[in-house]
Regions:
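Hydrophobic alpha-helical membrane segments
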Residues: 1-137, 141-203
Length: 203
């Protein structure tokens, strides 16, 4: 029981710590240009130090943030732009008085890609920790990785949904704890995806 309590306390404290680092880095980027590199930085810190919260240092976080700033923003806003175009296209289509079967099919395809874009960015967050990728290779490998492990994708969708439910009832947790937990979750569930891609790259 004592070890379980210690484990829970450590995880919650670590989640609060990295969430605080995340928000600080996000504001350093003026929010708009801080979100992507802040997420990439948190993933790198967690991959390096795991649950050893004493090893997390602002100086290292800031250094990683500066390294990640350009590439992470490029990838993040690529997916953001795709999402915006899809949403706007769907908005225009639903304004039509009578939708044909083909138009309904296009709407369904758009809905699928609305899920694929953020999913692919989550895969990118995992892969960028381990690979030094160009912009185009980041997009290609992340997109491929999103389809390599259906179980990981299912876990991500369910886990994100549950965190969303918790946020709905206790919004403060999102700003102080849940963001950190989400990054830990992404790191762990996409480990098989990383290992699969690494085995292909090495071979």
């Amino acid at each position: 029981m004592g070890r379980m309590i210690e484990f829970i306390f450590t995880r919650v404290y670590l989640a609060m710590l990295v969430t605080g680092i995340f928000w600080a880095l996000t504001f350093c980027g003026g929010i708009l240009f801080g979100f992507g590199p802040a997420s990439a930085t948190i993933m790198s810190l967690y991959a390096e130090h795991g649950s050893d919260y004493k090893q997390y240092a602002w100086s290292e976080a800031w250094s990683l943030y500066k390294e990640n700033f350009r590439r992470a923003n490029q990838v993040f806003y690529t997916f953001f732009l795709i999402e915006a175009i899809l949403i706007y296209g769907m908005y225009l289509m639903v304004q039509l008085p009578h939708l044909s079967l083909f138009q309904i099919f296009i709407l369904l395809v758009n809905l699928i890609f609305l899920l694929v874009a953020p999913l692919t960015f989550a895969v990118y967050l995992k892969l960028q920790v381990h690979f030094d990728l160009s912009y185009l290779n980041s997009l290609k490998l992340s997109f491929i990785g999103a389809f390599l492990d259906i179980r990981a994708v299912t876990k991500l969708l369910l886990g994100t949904f549950l965190l969303g439910v918790v946020t709905h009832f206790v919004p403060a947790l999102f700003f102080f704890v849940l963001l950190g937990l989400w990054h830990f979750f992404v790191n762990d569930i996409f480990q098989p995806v990383y290992e699969t891609i690494r085995s292909k790259v090495v071979s």
